Amino acid sequence: MVGQRVLLLVAFLLSGVLLSEAAKILTISTLGGSHYLLLDRVSQILQEHGHNVTMLHQSGKFLIPDIKEEEKSYQVIRWFSPEDHQKRIKKHFDSYIETALDGRKESEALVKLMEIFGTQCSYLLSRKDIMDSLKNENYDLVFVEAFDFCSFLIAEKLVKPFVAILPTTFGSLDFGLPSPLSYVPVFPSLLTDHMDFWGRVKNFLMFFSFSRSQWDMQSTFDNTIKEHFPEGSRPVLSHLLLKAELWFVNSDFAFDFARPLLPNTVYIGGLMEKPIKPVPQDLDNFIANFGDAGFVLVAFGSMLNTHQSQEVLKKMHNAFAHLPQGVIWTCQSSHWPRDVHLATNVKIVDWLPQSDLLAHPSIRLFVTHGGQNSVMEAIRHGVPMVGLPVNGDQHGNMVRVVAKNYGVSIRLNQVTADTLTLTMKQVIEDKRYKSAVVAASVILHSQPLSPAQRLVGWIDHILQTGGATHLKPYAFQQPWHEQYLIDVFVFLLGLTLGTMWLCGKLLGVVARWLRGARKVKKT
């Protein structure tokens, strides 16, 4: 078995080395936070594989807060949106996060934020210097991100083939995958694949709500499309999603629910993983103080650190103070409540090497917001979780974590110090959580190809074959009435009704003939 895997790996990699040439690849990141980090990692991997990679990247402190900027192995084209655009984005993003933190419906705030992104995209497309430079480079392939609609429009403007990456689990975007509603949960439903009758009713109804939300978000770019594409050749965003040669998905079946896939869909969950390094000496010394009790890691992602309320910070601190473990917490010191004296077992830092700490043998628990990259890192290192999801895909991610027994989830707006303390102790002491997530880690590590190898292998494949037409079903080109057999249903229904009508007519004729025959007989 091991020999077969080695041969498969060697054959897969050699085919790329022998048949592919260095391609010019453009990656696009106009969003910040984890969206940027994922595209940065993709760019690094493709550059290391021998391709010539350039990232078109929107710079700004708001977009990449608390992220250590390192020298890039690939080329970067940086651009800045006007200051008034940046202020509007920050204002609407803050409003969106506050809406989520309050537990209110996020969709309206998200649509308003997308409208600002549409305006920003229009500005970028009007930058003749940037667009002409990109056209002159004549890239072989463009790499776009699912929620960055502007990146799809740039690829279309350049008239270049493109591949896309979905930074979340399936369901948060419709790009043509078959999704049976009986066991594939719709994105905002917070259901698992094990649905009872009422769960299936909810999932069915939420499908229409989700479709409407997608239409609302995509329509925020209508004005941008009208402004920058001539009438008669204006793209439709929902069609561009189907046009992608490949879809890479930042997930894995060790985490996600099993579901149907198409040939042009590739799982690369765990792509963010890098070689483990020793943790910084000051953190290692802090961990050593707690001996066998170990430590708890607390991290809430690149964007949420600056939006934690003072009240929530106090509740969390009170909960951590009651643990026998040490607690390493990424929390900006400038946001720390001045009236709170830090507990002796709690250490706050502005930045920490999350993956290295998750790999530390003394870690006992990961307290997280439930972001996709964070959850995948925890699973890879076999660390159980307590999730405090806030927005977007985080709630759905924690539904999967709970369903697979990798941890427990608490709504952030309902958390209390006592509840959080009891939940953390429960997950640390109940070894079933640790066993389940360690088993998931084995699933991730035992795959014949790593996420990075799958990424470069499939990129090389479509570069060599000139696209992925052979991987796309004809359904992408079918009218909806053909795809869902509406025409067949109407035909068969008409045929059935016509046959019934004809039979009825014939029976009527026979009945009248029989009645007439009886009358003749009587006379």
Swiss-Prot record:
Its EC number is 2.4.1.17. InterPro entries: UDP-glycosyltransferase, UDP_glucos_trans, UDP_glycos_trans_CS. Residues 505-523 are cytoplasmic. PROSITE patterns: UDPGT (PS00375). It is a single-pass type I membrane protein. Its main location: membrane. Keywords: Glycoprotein, Glycosyltransferase, Membrane, Signal, Transferase, Transmembrane, Transmembrane helix. GO terms for molecular function: glucuronosyltransferase activity; UDP-glycosyltransferase activity. Residues 23-483 are extracellular. Glycans are attached at N52. It holds the Pfam family UDPGT. The chain crosses the membrane at residues 484-504. It catalyses: glucuronate acceptor + UDP-alpha-D-glucuronate = acceptor beta-D-glucuronoside + UDP + H(+). It is found in: Membrane. Residues 1-22 form the signal peptide. GO terms for cellular component: UDP-N-acetylglucosamine transferase complex. The keyword Signal applies. UDP-glucuronosyltransferases catalyze phase II biotransformation reactions in which lipophilic substrates are conjugated with glucuronic acid to increase water solubility and enhance excretion. They are of major importance in the conjugation and subsequent elimination of potentially toxic xenobiotics and endogenous compounds. Belongs to the UDP-glycosyltransferase family. This is UDP-glucuronosyltransferase 3A1. The lineage of its organism: Eukaryota, Metazoa, Chordata, Craniata, Vertebrata.
